[in-house]
Amino acid sequence: MDQMVLLTQQWLNKTYGDKPGFGSVITDGNTGWDTINGLIRALQIELGITATANNFGAGTTRKFNQRYPHGVKQQSDSDKSQSNVYSIIQGALWCKGYSTGNDITQNFYGGTGNAIKELKNDMGIGGDSTVTIDVMKALLSMQQFVLLKRYGGIDVIRIIQQTINRTYKDYTGIIPCDGLYGREMNTALIQILQSLEGYSPDDATGNFGHGTRGNLKTISRQNASSYGKWVWLAKAVLNCIRYDCLQNENWDDDFAEQLTKFQKDYKLPVSGALDVNTWMSLLTSKGNPDRAAKACDCATVLNAQQAKDLKAAGYQIVGRYLTGYVGKSTSKALTLDEIKNIKNAGLSVFPIYQDGGYYPEYFANPNQGTVDAQVAISAAKRIGIPSGSTIYFAVDFDAYGYQLDSMILPYFKKISLLFNSCENIKKYQVGVYGPRLICSKVSKAGYAKYSFVADMSTGFSGNLGYAIPNNWAFDQFNEFSFQSRPTFALDKDAYSGRDKGIAKFDSVTKMTKGELEKENIKDKVNIARTQFVYDVVEPLHLLNQLTSFGLSYN
C-alpha cells in the first residue's frame, strides 16, 4: 500500500463523492484502473462534462484544449489561486511514483513542477513543467515511463520509446517508456512508417493497410544513405524482437547480418534488403499475405483432384484435422481414403486436433486436456499416424494473460501428462496452435515440442509486439479460396522445416461402426481412469513430476 495513493483516493471520494457522474473509488492505497478512472472522471467534472466516462476521449480532449489551449502552467510563487485540476495532476503523479514533495493541494508550485519535469524527462521529451494535452493523457493512464526490468524491460527498447516520444509524438502520442515491446509500441512503429511515407498525423492510424503497403520503399545498402530514418525504423523493430543492432540511421555490417538472419528465421526470401516481404513481417504478424508458401491447412476432406492441385501449386505439406465437423454436419476429419489421395499427390500431412478451443469456456473444464489428449491419440492411431508424430492442439482465440495462466497452461499440462503415460504407446508429441504469446508460453513451460502459429489475426494482443516462437514449425498467414474441383477454403502456412510431417502412414484397417463404438467406450473408460489417478496424485503435490517420466497403472 502507498500512503500517497491512499490520500489521493480519499481526496477523490471526499471532493467528488456527492457529484453526479463520479461514484467512488476503492481506498486501498494501490494504483490501478479504478483510481486512474476516478481521476479521469474528476477531470471531466472540472471541465464541465456531465456525462462522465472512464475514458480520456475526444470530448475530454476538446474540453481540455478549450480550457487550457497552452497546457496547464506552473503557478508563480505569488499566485495564490487554487484549482482541483492541480490536485488531480498531483494525484496522478503520486500514482505513477513521482513525488510532489507535499500532500494533495490545490496549487501547482515548484514541487509539482519538478515532478512533471522528471516525468517528461523519463518520457524522453524534456522541457518545462507545463502539462500539455499529451502529458495529461499519459498522466491519466496506466502507462509507465521507467524501465520495468523485472517484467522483461530492456534499455535499448526504452531508448527507442523515448526517441519516438521526442520525435514522432504528433503521430503516436506519448507511448510508454518501460522497455517492453507490446501492442501500443507496435502501433506507434507503423505510425512512424506512415509518417515517413508522407501521411498526415490524422491519417497515420497505425493500421497496416493497402495504402501503407503501396508506399513502401525497397532499401538496400546501395540507397540506404538516402533513407536514414527508414533504416532507423527497421533497426528499432529488429531490436524490439531481439535481433540486436546499433540503433542509428546507418546501414552497417551488423545491421545487414541481423536483417539476413531475420529473413532466414522467418523463412522469407533472403534478399538482404528491406523489401515488401521484410517490412510487412517486421511490422505485422502475418507479413505479406501474397507471398508463396510450402505448407497449408484446411478443413476440407481432400479428393484426388484437390490434392493434385495443391501439389501443382507448390505446396508440400498440408495440415488436416483428426476429428470434428465444420458446422453441425460436414466432417473435417482426415480419412483413410483422403490419405491415399494425399500420398498419391506427393504431399505430406501434419495432424491438428480441434473439437472446440475457439472460446475461453472450453478450457475452463479442468478435465478437458485429458479428454482431448485421449481422443486425439485414439483418432491418430485409427488412421495410421506413425510413432513420434506431432499433433497440434488448438487455442483459437486471443487469450488474456490471466486466461493463459488459469486455463490454457493447465489444459496443456493435462495433455502433456497423458502423452507421457502408457496410454501413448505411439509416443506422439504435443504441438500447440495459437497466437505467438500462447505458443511461446506453452512451449516454454515444456508442454509443446513445436508451434503452429496463428499469425493471420494481426489484431490479436497475443500477436502484436511478440516475436515468432523459436520452435515454430508452421506459420499460418493467409486464408483464401483455392481454385480446384471443387474450390475450397485454404490457409497458407510458412514452413520452417522443423516438423517434416507425415509422408508414410502405418497400415490400418478401417473400423466398422460397431468397432468404433467399442473404441469410444474404451476411450471414455481410459479418460475416467486417468482423471481419477490425477485427482489422487494432485493433492500429494506429485502431479508436476509426472510430466517428466512415463506414468503407468492398472
PLM regions: where:
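Functionally critical loop-and-helix segments that line ligand-binding/catalytic clefts
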Residues: 291-298, 439-553
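N-terminal catalytic cores of peptidoglycan-degrading enzymes
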Residues: 278-359, 450-457, 534, 538-554
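Structural recognition of the beta-strand scaffold that forms the well-ordered cores
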Residues: 85, 92, 230, 237, ...
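Generic structural signal for well-ordered alpha-helices
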Residues: 307, 339, 373-377, 409-416
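Substrate-binding cleft of extracellular glycoside hydrolase catalytic domains
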Residues: 329-399
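Active-site cleft segment of glycoside hydrolase catalytic domains centered on the general acid/base Glu
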Residues: 399-423
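Cell-envelope/ECM-targeting effectors and their regulatory/trafficking segments
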Residues: 1-325, 554
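Aromatic-lined carbohydrate-recognition surfaces of secreted/lumenal glycan-active proteins
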Residues: 294-296, 422-441
